[in-house]
A protein has these predicted regions:
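N-terminal catalytic or cofactor-binding beta/alpha core of small enzyme domains
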Residues: 1-157
Length: 157
């Protein structure tokens, strides 16, 4: 499995101080601490890739043309989508749920829906604070399981 992700940059977006926004950093720490893959990991619980830090890192991420880029982030959606994972192959606007936005291009964007999206930004912030930890762990396990399969199918298989 190590070789599958050796040319990959995992961009694990989020703020480890906000439970619902910590999916990316939690996964980044998992991949880094367990040394499962030879991927470059950006964003961990000890060194989270929050919105403000992403502004500083964007040039580094964009300039690294040799790596396949996979963005992992939490998202808000409708109540029926909580716990689901959405995968796309396009650009991604980080911070969209709280009316901010930094565009990143990636080979894959993996979003785990952790709570309900509201029209009010303050409600969204509160929603992210009150996410059920069981939902986070369930989404994490799904992403850990599917990540090598995604890369394999796209680049090897």
């Amino acid at each position: 499995m190590k070789k599958i992700l050796e040319d990959v940059m995992l961009i694990c977006v989020g703020n480890s101080k906000v439970k619902g926004d910590s999916l990316g950093p939690m996964l980044g720490s998992f991949f880094e601490n367990n040394n499962l893959y030879d991927a470059i990991v950006i964003g961990t619980t000890n060194n989270p890739l929050s919105y403000n830090k992403l502004e500083q890192m964007k040039n580094y991420i964009d300039s690294n043309k040799l790596k396949k880029k996979i963005i992992i982030d939490s998202a808000l959606g409708n109540s029926m989508s909580i716990g689901k994972i959405y995968i796309s192959e396009k650009s991604f606007i980080v911070g969209d749920g709280v009316n901010k936005g930094i565009k990143l291009d990636a080979d894959f964007i993996i979003k785990g829906v952790v709570g309900t999206n509201h029209t009010c930004i303050e409600k969204n912030k509160k929603e992210l604070q009150n996410v059920d930890e069981k939902i986070l762990k369930s989404i994490m396990n799904k992403i850990i399981e599917i990540l090598p399969i995604l890369v394999w199918k796209k680049y090897i298989g």
